[in-house]
A protein has these predicted regions:
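Sec-dependent N-terminal signal peptides of Gram-positive bacterial secreted proteins and lipoproteins
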Residues: 1-19
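Generic secretory/membrane-interface signal
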Residues: 10-11, 27-29
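Phosphate-binding glycine-rich loops and adjacent basic patches that engage nucleotide phosphates
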Residues: 17-18, 39, 58, 102
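N-terminal secretory signal peptides
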Residues: 29-72
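Glycine-rich active-site loops that engage anionic ligands at enzyme catalytic sites
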Residues: 58-59, 63-144
């Protein structure tokens, strides 16, 4: 009987003991958003140190940037910070968010091939060109 009671007490202690698991990543619920002229776009970030640094920068507070047309394929402006570069030759597509020279943010609405770092991509570009319009534009990056 003592053995049975000892087993039951041990079992009760085991059941009530919290179970800790190692290496379980918390699901990221944060999404980067880009707001421009009344439109909000969700940005899917790349898996690189540049995108991680941008996320950290924007997490501190939302960032509003002035972007200007360049080459009839992108809007470009100063980030206000230098991010790590992971440059490679890539061909952009509409909605790509690109780091150029480590301190410039480029938002592509047409194709271009060059050496730069991809930061992310706008998930739904259906109204992107309409939102960007012609000339200079104010763009706000924030974490949801």
């Amino acid at each position: 009987m003592k053995k049975f009671v000892s087993v039951m007490v041990g079992l009760c202690l085991f059941i009530n003991k919290p179970i800790y698991r190692k290496n379980i990543k918390k699901k990221e619920s944060e999404a980067m958003l880009l707001e421009v002229n009344g439109y909000t776009f969700e940005v899917e970030l790349e898996n690189n140190t540049s995108a991680e640094a941008l996320k950290e920068y924007v997490s501190k507070e939302k960032r509003t940037l002035s972007l200007d047309d360049y080459g009839n394929f992108e809007k470009v402006g100063n980030l206000g910070i230098t991010l790590p570069r992971n440059d490679e030759t890539i061909t952009t597509k509409e909605g790509d968010l690109i780091l150029y020279l480590g301190n410039k943010l480029c938002l592509y609405y047409n194709q271009n091939t060059w050496d730069f770092t991809k930061l992310g991509h706008i998930k739904d570009t259906a109204h992107l060109k309409e939102a960007l319009g012609k000339g200079s534009v104010q763009v706000t990056l924030l974490m949801e």
